[in-house]
Regions:
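Conserved N-terminal structural module of periplasmic/extracytoplasmic solute-binding proteins
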Residues: 4-7, 22-111, 118, 171, ...
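Extracytoplasmic/periplasmic substrate-recognition and gating elements
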Residues: 69-70, 75, 167, 289-353
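A structural signal for short loop-to-beta-strand junctions that line the ligand-binding cleft
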Residues: 102, 129-164, 192-196, 309-313, ...
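Hinge/lid segment of periplasmic solute-binding proteins
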Residues: 107-156, 180, 186, 297-298
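Short, solvent-exposed loop/beta-turn-alpha elements that line the ligand-binding surface or hinge
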Residues: 121-137, 214-241, 289-291, 303-312, ...
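Extracytoplasmic/periplasmic solute-binding protein
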Residues: 146-148, 155, 180-231
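Conserved C-terminal helix/tail region of periplasmic/extracytoplasmic solute-binding proteins
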Residues: 165, 364, 380-432
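Glycine-centered hinge/linker elements that transmit conformational signals in sensory
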Residues: 185, 228-258, 424
Length: 432
């Protein structure tokens, strides 16, 4: 559902539906010069950036050129490990080998705690006061800010509106029963309802399973209980519900989901072979690259027949950029981060090139800027119909354990009881 009227993504709007507002004034790129960068001295320094968002690689490399024109004494070395690769393992290898980056990605919450002894306090940076509260939360501890959120993202089912209309589906499903009814209607017009990239561990172990956690009565208490041994995944109703959804997508999906990667399911969707895929609003640019101006939208993943509970989208910060406190180039790293969110060039790339939902109140965007998917996500945020993303609260390595257990369930190697036990065993092995 595309809104034609311009929308300012501001903290004032978010205040009414999520948290109390935080104020902020516009900054300019000139602020960054006050951070002690090498830009005004003769010394040339290199800032090594190690991040995982593969969909922004082209844009980052273009911004690197523009930034280095403005700051000729700062050179950016940008490396990306993402997609199907294990970024967390690669980051640990970087630090262990003595090739630690100056800027790297961090998911916040438990991941912030894990890397706490490497994180520079960024509380004094000019952009901090402009953070939207929802976006600031994952990297805030004891009133201090340790990371710059790249954007807000929503995760759900991306769907082809034209195929839905052709199949006679007039409303997006809000229950698992309605979802199956929609799938049957799509099959009736010879369209594969779901494209499932279940080869991808992150799609299952980070994004998909987040819904089963988010729908707990109190997710933070549940996670604390898992760590303390007072709560369990085994026999938990929400996990059974989620497995029912998983089985439904396999039943109405393409063949061989466990050997289908994200690029394939994106291509199948963009070419009209499938009507739905589990994705986030970052898929907008990826779909546009294959089929420009495709009529698409997003809705939450319903795991049962509680329409009110299911009509909430998983929304949060996918990644924060943090600064290595031991870096010899940390002031230059701060200069780049500030430039990224305060310069006209940086802000343009954030909303127009990457179609990001901004995490700062000083970055304006319209639905036309952020695309149909971003506009749908923002509508859920405005209406207060959101669940937070949960994976950053998990013990390190659990997401891969989860994915392995889920893939065993899909393959039929375990039944539901065995799957739940496998999920619990993965948590117990890695909890602290």
């Amino acid at each position: 559902m595309k809104k034609r009227s311009a929308v300012m993504l501001s903290s004032v709007m978010l205040m009414s539906v999520v948290l109390a507002a935080c104020g902020g004034n516009n900054n300019t790129a000139s602020n960054s010069a006050s951070n002690g960068s090498a830009g005004n001295s003769g010394e040339v320094k290199t800032v090594k950036v190690f991040q995982f968002k593969t969909e922004i690689v082209e844009g980052l490399n273009e911004l690197k050129v523009e930034f280095e024109k403005e700051y000729p004494n700062i050179k950016l070395d940008i490396q990306t490990v993402g997609g199907g690769a294990d970024y967390a393992a690669a980051l640990k290898t970087k630090f262990a080998s003595g090739d630690a980056p100056d800027i790297f990605s961090n998911g916040g919450y438990a991941e912030m705690e894990l890397w706490g002894d490497k994180l520079e306090d960024l509380s004094d940076q000019p952009w901090v006061k402009d953070l939207i509260p929802l976006a600031a939360e994952p990297m805030t501890k004891d009133g201090k800010t340790y990371g710059m959120p790249m954007n807000l993202e929503g995760i759900g089912y991306v769907y082809n509106k034209d195929l839905f209309a052709k199949a006679g589906i007039t409303e997006t499903p809000k229950t698992i029963t309605e979802l199956e009814e929609a799938a049957k209607k799509l099959q009736a017009i010879d369209v594969i309802p779901f494209g499932n990239a279940y080869q991808e561990w992150w799609l299952l172990g980070i994004q998909g399973i987040s819904v089963a956690f988010a729908q707990q009565d109190n997710v933070d208490e549940f996670i604390s209980g898992l760590n303390a041994g007072t709560a369990t995944i085994v026999g938990n109703e929400k996990f059974k519900d989620w497995s029912n959804l998983l089985n439904l997508t396999v039943k109405y999906g393409q063949k061989n989901p466990l050997t289908t990667d994200a690029n394939t399911h994106l291509a199948m969707f963009a070419n009209g072979e499938t009507a739905m895929m589990q994705e986030g609003n970052w898929a907008q640019t990826l779909v546009d690259n294959i089929t420009p101006d495709m009529n698409i939208g997003m809705f939450p993943m319903p795991i049962n027949d509680d329409a009110a509970m299911n009509d909430k989208l998983s929304v949060g910060v996918p990644a924060n950029l943090v600064v290595n406190k031991d870096s010899a180039s940390k002031e230059e790293a701060k200069t780049f981060l500030n430039w990224l969110v305060t310069s006209d060039m940086g802000k343009e790339y954030i909303v127009k090139k990457w179609k990001f939902i901004p995490a700062l109140s000083t970055i304006a965007a319209t639905p036309e800027d952020i695309g149909l998917l971003g506009a749908d996500v923002w509508n859920y945020v405005q209406e207060g119909k959101v669940y937070g993303l949960q994976a950053s609260k998990f013990p390190d390595g659990v997401t891969q354990e989860f994915a392995s257990s889920i893939q065993e369930l899909i393959a039929g190697k375990v039944d539901e009881a065995g799957w739940e036990k496998g999920m619990q065993a993965g948590w117990d092995k890695l909890k602290k």
